[in-house]
Amino acid sequence: MVHPVQVGKRTRMSFAKVKDVAEMPNLIEIQLDSYKWFLDAGLYEVFDDINPISNFTGNLVLEFVGYTLDMDNIKYSVEECKERDTTYAAPLKVAVRLQNKETGEIKEQEVFMGDFPLMTEQGTFIINGAERVIVSQLVRSPGVYYNYNVDKTGKKLFSATVIPNRGAWLEYETDSNDVIYVRIDKTRKLPISILGRAMGFGSDQELLEYFGEEERFKATIEKDNTKTKEEALLEIYKRLRPGEPPTVDSAISLIDSLFFDAKRYDLSRVGRYKFNKKLAIGLRIANQIAAEDIVDKLTGEVLVAKGEKISRANAEEIQNRGINSVDVLVEDRVIRIIGNHFVDIHKCVDFDISDLNIRELVHYPTLREILDNYSDEETIKEEIKKNMTRLIPKHIIKDDIFATISYQIGLAYNIGYVDDIDHLGNRRLRSVGELLQNQFRIGLSRMERVVKERMTIQDQEAITPQQLINIRPVAAAIKEFFGSSQLSQFMDQTNPLSELTHKRRLSALGPGGLSRERAGFEVRDVHHSHYGRMCPIETPEGPNIGLINSLATYAKVNEYGFIETPYRVVDKSEGRVTGEIRYFTADEEDQYLVAQANEPLDENGCFIDKKVTVRDKGEVLVVPSKDVDLMDVSPRQLVSVATAMIPFLENDDASRALMGSNMQRQAVPLLKPYAPIVGTGIEYKAAVDSGVLPKAKNAGEVVYVSANEVRVKRELDGGVDTYRLLKFKRSNQGTCINQRPIVAKGDWVLKGEVLADGPSTDLGEIALGKNIRMGFITWEGYNYEDAMLISEELVREDVFTSIHIEEYECEARDTKLGPEEITRDIPNVSEDALKDIDERGIIRIGAEVRSGDILVGKVTPKGETELTAEERLLRAIFGEKAREVRDTSLRVPHGEAGIIVDVKVFTRENGDDLSPGVNELVRCYIAQKRKISVGDKMAGRHGNKGVISRVLPEEDMPFLPDGRPLQICLNPLGVPSRMNIGQVLEVHLGWAASALGWHIATPVFDGATETDIEDCLEKAGYNRNGKTVLRDGRTGEEFDNEVTVGIMYILKLAHLVDDKIHARSTGPYSLVTQQPLGGKAQFGGQRFGEMEVWALEAYGAAHTLQEILTVKSDDVVGRVKTYEAIVKGENIPEPGVPESFKVLIKELQALCLDVKVLNDNNQEVKFKELAEDDDEIEVLEVNMEGTEDSTTEEAKEEKGEAYIPAEEIDEEIDYENIDLLDFTSDLDIEDDFN
């Protein structure tokens, strides 16, 4: 039943029936751990890969010995970096050793390799002052993938792809004549036997002896026109390098460099792991019938007798004894299975080698060689260490290639299985660390080329490592990655949840991933392996659906980049669920039967029911309880954080739940945050891990609290930790970040405890919206189409008021005509317009500004015209003062207004880093307090979104029997067809809880039942059906039926009407078509498109239509005349010819078509050009001819005139009577064109 739970500083009444057995991991550890790995091991691996760099003669050798990140020399703190637009980074210093083999001289030096961006504690990077997140990328894992197509006759044709991390691909395919072909690196296909010959089996006999007498292979050999190893090599060389003279030596070196050179071909640890998993002989021969006795060559022991079934244990032993080729019987045929000769080293060595920390399988022939040559433990250990790259090769080896061919042959006989590339066992994550490592590797390899060049050019005696190394390519690669990679994204900082979700996002797009256009339906679909790893709900709507996902709540990423999810282990002998929790990757989990988290258990942890519902891959089965292997740790383990914050998620339709989880990320932080009365219990964890709350670094006593800082006296050493709070800072999205202390002086705090609330948090819990008293009732049609009717109380009491801060900057640059100047002395500006400007020319803090007001006064020198003698004389007498300047001040843009909350000034004199050519930079911050208004978008947590249609006086709202009016009325029709019933349950439970004074936790898939809610309603003294008699606020009469009334948690979304409303006066025009630009940012017009024209045509509104297509759009002369007529109060003149029509004619003429416009009398119409009407326009001082450049808003604004951009007059060319001599005069045209 319902029981109290302590969440931070608040007690919630929880309806959860399942006890939490596993702690949820830190929600941003995917970022933190990956970056930590990069600094600790990833960087070292890159340097290790590139070591040593030697010149072509080999007598100069450059080695990278070690590296340090100089954490003491970080220039600015995180906050300062944001303020100064710089990157939060530490200098990377690398110890380099240069060895001259001729002289034996060794020089060591520490080389500075550029500033390396650091991750903040919140898992973000500050790049050029902007907070960015590196999104993890989901890519196909390196490995071998088999699949099949069915041909016309219904025969399965198997194919395979061998995908390395980087290097040449191998692709196998079978045609309908059973010939197996190979493509090397996407070239033309060759019979596979050619590859076998080139790898060492020259004759047909050798091939058949090794791979076994199998029909398909024989057919392939018949198709093969080469007969020896040399011929095969030459054949491959011809295919790969057509047009070059083939020789055996060059063919051998080509194949070596393609596949067996670690610098050119890299499987990575993951690739090696997947290869061994797929190709190792153990799993492939298990459960097959042995065709011959399987004998250990070393001891002569028979492991499996002929005709016996090979058990799983036997198979593993056979593999670890180093037996690599086994014949099995399939339907009376003998099929040979060849493994890739990798074994578990711990089973082959009879002493303890755990200190070598080898976790992968090792290459048996290499290991055998070491064991045969040495006998004592220490030497063997030393040799194993020395030969690590041979034992665990990062590139492909011949044994791998033979094993892949053998697997391809075996598939036709149902030995082995084909792969599903959408399975999460075959897709892995590249997180920050690995993405950075790849970038760094690119930079280093570019640098390596430079080093090699410099080694040959420079004097070898006097050379130092510093002179050899050029750090530019490395710095550029890193900078490019952080600045412009598709995976480095501007952090979504609307609220703490959006920040947290962004850091946990998984994208299949980006370099090396998929592209939107190519991604088919399968990749985007939900897969059974997503369970507990990726959220099946949270993904964007639109073209990216299914390509961008979110990590599930309990998921972790393992060392190979595969996503793991935790399960409770079931002891099958007793049928008891143990306390052990193990993490499984998707392919490990596939062998087990998994019970749900809410399966009832007794107090000993045994299943109560005899039959248990379990998952087996994608199937749901009911099995006896003794067969269950694993059990989920929590009901919320399959969804992401945002989805887990929707109460009664199990009662919502999936597509509405998707909108609900996406819209929570768009909730604007409100002035006074309130946590939801009906929560799910994950709010506290989400807020604490999101990084917006200051947490105590050490336990201790709070000794000082103010709005700006909290000081805690440490328990350990008595020192004091000071925590500065952020006050009214602007987030990336323009919302307001403000932290408020929630501890008092004298409080004792523990390590990790929350000290202050941030944006959208209440007592450390995420609080995205407000608990609102609402009813499902229609009201005079104001609920039509999901609209919402709200009470004036919400406006008056600032319930949905939010603060938005915009940043505007103005820079004074050096121009060709002289420097720009920030000053109060602006030409043609009244004193009234300067009333809030200080003597520097910058607005004062606290001033209230409206659109068009000056923020920063700035003047720019005007172009000097040729001076007359008199002017020169005056200039000589009175000095420079007479210089012409124009006003280029920074003004508040259209539709913006507010109060100046902060001004920052950066100048060269103060030693601030400014970009080249900039002398001074001023930033102004304008804050707006936005109350809720008609047109704002609001939503619940169940995907129930709507726009406010009317703000009704409080006294007119429907009211309850006790006289309280409703605050919001929602349309009851929004529920049944959308199937998001969760909102109704939330309303009922919230109604009861608010009366009882409770805050509630009802976790997803394990929340309050209908009976629970009815009991709560009864306890609160309400009707069990949750309905109430309502009266009309205007008449006081009761409504006909009872109405569902209750408390719903409602969010205000970041789609505010103030940002969207827009009206154009005279503004900029497109250069070619002379039509107004589009969009609010360009101060554009509304497009009157094709369909709108049809509508007017249908009504026969000819004059309206003509007006819209001419004077209101691109009739350049006509619009000037119309403006003039309106100003003078005259009738509007006849429209002229639209500019776009002229453009069309010019385009046709450009295609050498003789196009003329004729009138009724078949006479040619000459178009009137703007130039002819110059004099008329001048009188008006207005120019209706626009340019696309909307930045030259000048002094016209002050006079209150419309801004009209600078004039453009094209010279008209008379194409008919053009003189060809004009074109030919400068050309020598010869007569002979042959």
Curated annotation (Swiss-Prot):
The keyword Nucleus is annotated on this UniProt entry: no
Protein name: DNA-directed RNA polymerase subunit beta
Free-text function comment from the UniProt entry: DNA-dependent RNA polymerase catalyzes the transcription of DNA into RNA using the four ribonucleoside triphosphates as substrates.
EC number: 2.7.7.6
GO cellular component: DNA-directed RNA polymerase complex
Pfam families documented for this protein: RNA_pol_Rpb2_1 (PF04563), RNA_pol_Rpb2_2 (PF04561), RNA_pol_Rpb2_3 (PF04565), RNA_pol_Rpb2_45 (PF10385), RNA_pol_Rpb2_6 (PF00562), RNA_pol_Rpb2_7 (PF04560)
Gene Ontology terms describing biological process: DNA-templated transcription
Protein keywords: DNA-directed RNA polymerase, Nucleotidyltransferase, Transcription, Transferase
GO MF assignments: DNA binding; DNA-directed RNA polymerase activity; ribonucleoside binding
Organism: Clostridium perfringens (strain SM101 / Type A)
Catalytic activity: RNA(n) + a ribonucleoside 5'-triphosphate = RNA(n+1) + diphosphate
Gene3D superfamilies attached to this UniProt entry: 2.40.50.100, 2.40.50.150, 3.90.1100.10, DNA-directed RNA polymerase, beta subunit, external 1 domain, DNA-directed RNA polymerase, subunit 2, domain 6, RNA polymerase alpha subunit dimerisation domain, RNA polymerase Rpb2, domain 2
HAMAP family, A to Z: RNApol_bact_RpoB
Highest taxon of source: Bacteria
Family of the protein in this entry: Belongs to the RNA polymerase beta chain family.
Subunit and partners: The RNAP catalytic core consists of 2 alpha, 1 beta, 1 beta' and 1 omega subunit. When a sigma factor is associated with the core the holoenzyme is formed, which can initiate transcription.
